[in-house]
Amino acid sequence: MIHELHNNPELTGQVRLIENITYAAVAGCPLKMQILAPWTQRYPKQYHTDPRPLIVFVQGSSWRTGRMGEEIPQLVQFVKHGYVVATVQHRSAIDGFTFPAFLKDVKTAIRFLRHKATKYAIDPHRVAIWGTSSGANAAMLVGLTGDDPRYKSHLYAHESDRVDAVVSCFAPMDVPDTFKASAKVPGNKLLQFCLFGMDTSKWPAEMAAMSPLDVAEPGQDYPPFLLMHGDADQVVPYHEMVDMYNKLDKDGYDVEAYRVKGANHERDFWSQQVYDIVLDYLNQKVK
């Protein structure tokens, strides 16, 4: 028997991966991103694609240059639910780029995406950032320092790097505490020198500037935050999320938090339930 199916003239549910887009070149270092977009975006003359809310995803990497493609298979589902997703890389601390290089890069990526919003079918007024581990540290800092001139480069300077929602998965919220907890991990001290420089007298101030728990202040115009963390995390202590939640909540900010029972760092943290919670949250806040 020959079965019959209808075609898909609107390309509904089809996702396009646009690889190795250079969004900036800093100190001779090309910075890349990958974009997941609806297939119709590829054929603007044949198809109209309504602007979609954007998710900027920052992969955890211990503040090195993260692997952009690691979460691509999981992120496809968000495009099928009406988003454009960009996974962005940043300069690596171990290559000599101290804090706040990674933060400046992620903010530059956001401004680039707003600048190219029409090309990639992005609604520049609906932008969320989502990060994991060190990428979640970057995401939190982006949310807490929107358009802060200290972290703004000259690239696409007319665009805003503010975001409309932040999703943080197992982020270092208290950087000194994170490094203390992982003191026995090989390379721990070297990474601190890479992030904060050779003058250790400056480390406390630099660590504070990189710690969302220290950066957050009352009376600011912050976006809503979704915090998620495994209570068996062996890399970033779970209590850091609790402390961050309590601080934001006490100061009257829009914040939700989830404890993932028995979950370590990455790996068994992830489940379809986690992705569904993130999707539902973003649908409420930016869609």
Identify the residue ranges that each predicted region occupies.
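Alpha/beta-hydrolase superfamily serine-hydrolase fold, recognizing
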Residues: M1-K287
